[in-house]
Amino acid sequence: MKKVLLQNHPGSEKYSFNGWEIFNSNFERMIKENKAMLLCKWGFYLTCVVAVMFVFAAITSNGLNERGLITAGCSFLYLLIMMGLIVRAGFKAKKEQLHYYQAKGIEPLSIEKLQALQLIAPYRFYHKQWSETLEFWPRKPEPGKDTFQYHVLPFDSIDIISKRRESLEDQWGIEDSESYCALMEHFLSGDHGANTFKANMEEAPEQVIALLNKFAVFPSDYISDCANHSSGKSSAKLIWAAELSWMISISSTAFQNGTIEEELAWHYIMLASRKAHELFESEEDYQKNSQMGFLYWHICCYRRKLTDAELEACYRYDKQFWEHYSKKCRWPIRNVPWGASSVKYS
């Protein structure tokens, strides 16, 4: 039987299409676009409360007059209609998501590609994004290509896409596919940070250990092990988890913004994934190295020297994704098996 792709409603942690939650999340989205919608939201809640009060009065009172009974009846009908709209929102969200996949030709991913996206699943889960497709948020169909009327499924706004493109350009120098490829090769060469960690651990390991443990608790033997080249591996672990996570996240974002094509994004994502599953024994092993790597990079490689308070904030920021994911996530991506460590990176 063919697998049907179905993910969370964007903006929700739940995989079930909870009509009330979707109804509320759409209200929040509309309020961001138009502050006046806040009055509509609270007006809706207020009318529901008043309707409940009228219905309660009708049930508990022994002698409502005719006008009171009519008011209570209308209030009850109003509540039924509102409940119907809320339930409908859940069904409509599911229908729209399925239609979106069909219209765009999006199919369930192979296990290998799911294993690749699992590497950044904690970040996507924290931000309530999609986890089983390359695009992490629905992208508005091009004019004329999909005439279906979407009412519940939230799309990336032009403003958000513009800000992400600006961020990729400012932080990573990505303007087109050529500059994207140059950055990916820079990561794979180790020159972004992995080689610096290796050199520093060879020259002054005690200093590196002291710097890292100023903001977090990484056992000294663990940090030393990351610098040692194990037999049968293409390299030492170094801070490769952080580097590879950046590669996958940047590739996904560049595709989401329309900067690069899907095929190119998957090419580098799968290169990163194969290296990750060759070097690390489990998801926990990968995420631990990732946290250490992000912290090290911000201490020793970032173009601007950060204060201790900023470094501590960076570490807490990166750590929260895995903590939240490991405690709360019930998404299918959580159950994807770790890739075979025997698969060599090439």
Curated annotation (Swiss-Prot):
This is Inner membrane protein YnjI. One of its GO terms (cellular component) is plasma membrane. The keyword Transcription regulation does not apply. It comes from the Bacteria. It is found in: Cell inner membrane. It comes from Escherichia coli (strain K12). Keywords: Cell inner membrane, Cell membrane, Membrane, Transmembrane, Transmembrane helix. Residues 1-38, 90-234 are periplasmic. Pfam families: DUF1266 (PF06889). The keyword Cell membrane applies.
